[in-house]
Structures are given as C-alpha cells and as structure tokens.
C-alpha cells in the first residue's frame, strides 16, 4: 500500500500569492520603465547546500511547473496588492490578466 502523500498544486486553493514580493515590485518597475514586453529572467535557487551538505538533489520540478502554469491573480489578490499602495494600476490590470507564456529551464528531476 502506498502511504506517500503528494501535493497536487492544480487541486489546491489559489497559491499565486506565494510569489516573492520582490519579483512583483521588479515586474512593476519593468512595466513603469516601458519594458513590459522585454524578456526577463527570474530564478529559483539556493546559494548554499543546507546543513553543511555536500550535494543537493533536484526534486519537485513537476510541482514548480504546475504552480507557474496555474498562476492567476484573482480579485482578492489584486485588491490586497492595491491596498499596499506599491503598484501602479496598469500593473495591477496586467496581473489580473496574467498568463505565463515563458520557458522553464531546469536540471533533470532526481539529479
């Protein structure tokens, strides 16, 4: 019997707001600078192997891809971001209509 629990991003509540706030502020800056259509890169990584470890194994790539592909800012997300008074209305409108269309480059799962 398989007792392993998995996390299915597609069937969970909206996880969009787990995004890094810095990424949102930078994206708003790109838009305000007229670079809305410029290709940019954001990374998901760590700088140092934890606990003085000597290696790391890539795991969870499928869930990362599902998360990115399902990113959708709902009305509550937009209202919250608006309440912070950090983002332009143009950017909030952009987020409300956002759909990921980029590419994801990653190490092979399990390596």
Task: Enumerate the predicted regions with their spans.
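Ordered alpha/beta subdomains of enzyme catalytic regions
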Residues: 1-111
């Amino acid at each position: 019997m398989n007792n392993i629990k998995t996390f299915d991003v597609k069937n969970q509540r909206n996880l969009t707001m787990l995004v890094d706030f810095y990424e949102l502020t930078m994206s708003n800056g790109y838009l305000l600078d007229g670079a809305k259509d410029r290709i940019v890169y954001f990374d998901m990584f760590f700088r140092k192997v934890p606990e003085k470890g000597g290696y790391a194994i890539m795991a969870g790539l499928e869930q990362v891809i599902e998360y990115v592909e399902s990113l959708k800012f709902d009305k509550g997300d937009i209202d919250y971001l608006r309440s912070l008074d950090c983002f332009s209305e143009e950017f909030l409108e952009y987020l409300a209509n956002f759909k990921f269309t980029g590419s994801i480059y990653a190490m092979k799962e399990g390596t």
